[in-house]
Amino acid sequence: MTKITGIIAEFNPFHKGHEYLLNQIDGLKIVAMSGNWMQRGEPAIFDKWTRAEMALSCGADLVVELPVMVSVQAADFFASGAVDILKNLGITDLAFGSESAIDYNEIADIYETKETEMESFIKALPDQLSYPEKTQMMWQHFTGIKFDGNTPNHVLALAYAKAAAGKNINLQAIKRVGKFHSTKLTEGFASATALRQQLFSLTDEVGQSLFSLTDLSAIENHVPSVILETYASPKTNWAAYFPLLQYKIRLDDHLENIFQVNQELSVRLKNAIKSAKNFDELVELVYTKRYTKARVRRLLTYILLNIPKEFNLPKEIHILGFSKAGQEILAQNRGKIISKIGQKPWDELTQKADEIYQLGNVDFKEQNFGRKPIIKREK
């Protein structure tokens, strides 16, 4: 049986740590990658096609897109949607980075055995606790796992274990190397956060590039050389969309019709938008112990993208790119995939979200209609 390993990723942006992860994996590698909107509620620095090209250049065999309402979700829902897509494509293994050395297969077995009891435990916890707090308390109670507050990939890995429970998927945790959430460029593997900060120190307030290829020397030690030039591609960040968000919040009298926005949050948002000067300031004004900053960023993304309370996820899987080996996987999954969005639509919410994303930089190309999967050139 051919080993097919799934990787769930954002690659925002792709760096040497991601290359290291791919190099640790044997067999065929399928990446389920967030599109143009990220799990923690922010636009991707580079568009989905640019990031898919980076992944293919550095070892991925097939890159498929996570629909926007899988990618912009809390960890459990993000993991569940992504694992379902990868399982549908026939993965045997799921690889991910983690700060912990625990056996995640054992964790998946515990959840499979005690799912009902564990979910009931969460529901019985006080409402004033945030969902991440409840989830961590559940894991601590049933497995004895301890959290030190600085293990974001460990938390996500537990969500993968939960999503993979009972699906006959082998979990392969790869030890993280370097400071993956540091905001500074240091020796060794730099974090995506540090790279984004460095890139936007070289751009104007709406993300328009102020540098040429010759100015990429500040990051060249942290990026695979084969994709360094790709870093000169058009970029964006929340600064480009904040005026649109201000307009939406100020004029929409029914924000509670947006996904996960309740009356309390609607009032908080209406009040906060009067004084917030930028996106980060708005998040600071709205968040509470119960409504974490990550949750508020996602809510603001839902508002910008006009996500309704009820929606359906697409059945087909959108292909962003593939290698020769990846083409074999596609051949085995005809009927499940969509390779070109045009006469046949894919996911209305994702396609509309991409239209809004394009407003973030005048140099962004059309994101869906007429775009064909990237085919990796074999050496």
Curated annotation (Swiss-Prot):
Pfam families hit by this protein: HIGH_NTase1
Record keyword tRNA processing present: yes
The keyword Ubl conjugation appears for this protein: no
EC number(s) given by UniProt: 6.3.4.-
Record key words, sorted: ATP-binding, Cytoplasm, Ligase, Nucleotide-binding, RNA-binding, tRNA processing, tRNA-binding
Principal cellular location given in the protein's record: cytoplasm
The reaction(s) this protein catalyses: cytidine(34) in elongator tRNA(Met) + acetate + ATP = N(4)-acetylcytidine(34) in elongator tRNA(Met) + AMP + diphosphate
A biological process term (GO) from this entry: tRNA modification
Subcellular localization(s) per the UniProt record: Cytoplasm
Gene Ontology, cellular component aspect: cytoplasm
Binding site for ATP: 8-21, 97, 153, 176
Domain of life: Bacteria
GO MF term set: ATP binding; ligase activity, forming carbon-nitrogen bonds; tRNA binding
Protein family per UniProt: Belongs to the TmcAL family.
Function: Catalyzes the formation of N(4)-acetylcytidine (ac(4)C) at the wobble position of elongator tRNA(Met), using acetate and ATP as substrates. First activates an acetate ion to form acetyladenylate (Ac-AMP) and then transfers the acetyl group to tRNA to form ac(4)C34.
Protein name per the record: tRNA(Met) cytidine acetate ligase
